Design a protein with these regions (language model features):
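Structural signal for interior beta-strand "rungs" in well-ordered beta-sheet cores
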Residues: 5-6, 10-127, 131-132, 137-139
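Strongly charged
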Residues: 143-146
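Charged phosphate-binding loop/patch that engages nucleotide di/tri-phosphates or the phosphate backbone
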Residues: 157-170
Length: 170
C-alpha cells in the first residue's frame, strides 16, 4: 500500500515495483528499477527516504528516520530480508545482509558488504570496499573484485525478478 502522510505523497518511478503488501508512507522516493518486496515498510513520516536506481528492499525490511536524519540508499544496493535501516546512508553497489541493523547517521561506503545480523552503530563510517561483520560491526577486510561483481549481479537479479512478479501475479 502507498499512503500519503501530512500532504507528503510517495514518489514511485513508473518503472519501479512495490509488492502489494509492502507499505510506503510519506516522504519516500523510489527511482527507476528499484523494488520493494513483500512486507517491507518504508516510513517517511519524519524525514526523506530515497531508494536509488536499481536497488532492492527485500521482504520484511523496515526503513525509518528520526528528525535530522534522512535515509539515502544509492544505486544497485541490495537490502536483504529483515534489515532495519534508520536514518543512514548506503553507498552505491553495496549489499546489506539478512537481519542487519544500521542506525542514525551511519555511512556505508560504495561496494561494501555488511554481513548478516551485523549492527552498525550511530555515526559509524564504513569505508568503500569493506566487508563488515559482527555486533558492533567491524571491518574485517576489503572486498574482492569477484565479490563486487557478485553484488552487482545480485542487484541485476532483483531488477529482473520484480519484472517477472509484476507480469505473473498482478
Amino acid at each position: 500500500m502507498i499512503y500519503d502522510f501530512e500532504k507528503n505523497i510517495p514518489e514511485v518511478h513508473s518503472e519501479a515495483w512495490v509488492a502489494a503488501n509492502a507499505t510506503i508512507i510519506g516522504k519516500v522516493k523510489l527511482e527507476k528499477n528499484s523494488s520493494i518486496w513483500f512486507n517491507a515498510t518504508l516510513r517517511g513520516d519524519i524525514e526523506n527516504i530515497y531508494v536509488g536506481e536499481g536497488s532492492n528492499i527485500q521482504d520484511g525490511s523496515v526503513l525509518h528516520t528520526d528528525p535530522g536524519y534522512t535515509l539515502k540508499i544509492g544505486k544497485n544496493v541490495t537490502v536483504g530480508h529483515l534489515v532495519m535501516l534508520h536514518g543512514c546512508t548506503i553507498g552505491d553497489n553495496s549489499l546489506i545482509g539478512i537481519g542487519a541493523v544500521i542506525l542514525n547517521n551511519a555511512k556505508i561506503g560504495k561496494n561494501c558488504i555488511i554481513g548478516a545480523k551485523a549492527l552498525i552503530t550511530e555515526n559509524k563510517e564504513i569505508p568503500d570496499n569493506s566487508l563488515v561483520i559482527g555486533a558492533p560491526g567491524k571491518v574485517i577486510r576489503q572486498v574482492t573484485e569477484e565479490e563486487v561483481k557478485s553484488i552487482t549481479e545480485n542487484a541485476i537479479h532483483y531488477q529482473n525478478n520484480w519484472k517477472k512478479y509484476s507480469e505473473s501475479i498482478f
